[in-house]
Amino acid sequence: MSEAQWVRIDNGKGYSVPVTWVSGGGPVFLVMGALGVAAPFYDKLVAELAAQGWSVALMEQRGLGSSALRPSRRHNWSFRDVVEDDVPAVLDWIAREATRQPVYLFGHSLGGHYAAMCAGLYPQRFEGIVMCACGSPWITAYQEADRRRVQRLTRLIPLCHLLFGYYPGDRLGFGGREARGVMSDWRHLALTNRYRLGADDRRVDQSLADYTGPALMLRMENDPFASAIAVDSVLRRFQRHRPEEQVLSAGELNDKADHFRWARRPAAVVARLARWLEEEGVGRRTLDVER
């Protein structure tokens, strides 16, 4: 495994995206994390992916960890900024750094939603997507106590934005300190189960319905945030080609099969990924990396 490099990638809109890069052969995995989770949480996943000889680009989220931004009344961003500006900039950088290597988007939770949105908007830019522990926060996908918690959050989020100018998830126990635009889009998803970029909540889902590229959903058996119903609420968007869904148990993970524990011991996740890649045939499609 080559030594990790830390780079900042200019997105052309006044922001530099922090990325941890490990160069290897074979496919490249662009890893995107969960809501409120900084990049170092995925260090073991990066090491496990790199141990396969693969290249890895771990993208830090805006407002977390090594990001120069922090959400406030003055500093705000949304799903659209990440999906239309940050991810394409990182893909451009990967195309220059790892010429002709197939690229896969690997997203955990919110990162999985970002991967799905990218699949709807510019599927020609990468080979396929992997969504891990990625369920929709759609209220209808939850029952009883869990549903009430999501409903309370949808009411609390606008109030927080008025009071603080951002969402203080680090104090509320859900997510981190998040930009109001991100949480407004998350709230819209919880209320409608539709991805929203700016004022448009139709374009992405309409495009994603036609996606036919390789796609894998890894679901944890006892994940309250990404239950079978919540995961199905994501997968139903893919109307022409439903992603393959695989379920990992506590026995396979050698730890609790929940929303976060898999990342502590990611060997089972990476083993599933390796088998899926072998079945799919890595790099079988021609990538339009030059746009």
Locations of the language-model features?
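N-terminal cap/lid segment of alpha/beta-hydrolase-fold proteins
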Residues: 1-21
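Alpha/beta-hydrolase active-site loop
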Residues: 76-95
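Short alpha-helix in the alpha/beta-hydrolase fold that links the catalytic acid
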Residues: 213, 227-237
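Alpha/beta-hydrolase-fold enzymes
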Residues: 106-194
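Conserved alpha/beta-hydrolase
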Residues: 39-41, 46-71
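Active-site glycine-rich loops that stabilize anionic/oxyanionic intermediates
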Residues: 26, 34-37
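Catalytic active-site module of serine/aspartate enzymes centered on a nucleophile-bearing elbow/loop
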Residues: 247-291
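Short beta-strand/loop motif that positions the catalytic acidic residue
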Residues: 211, 217-219
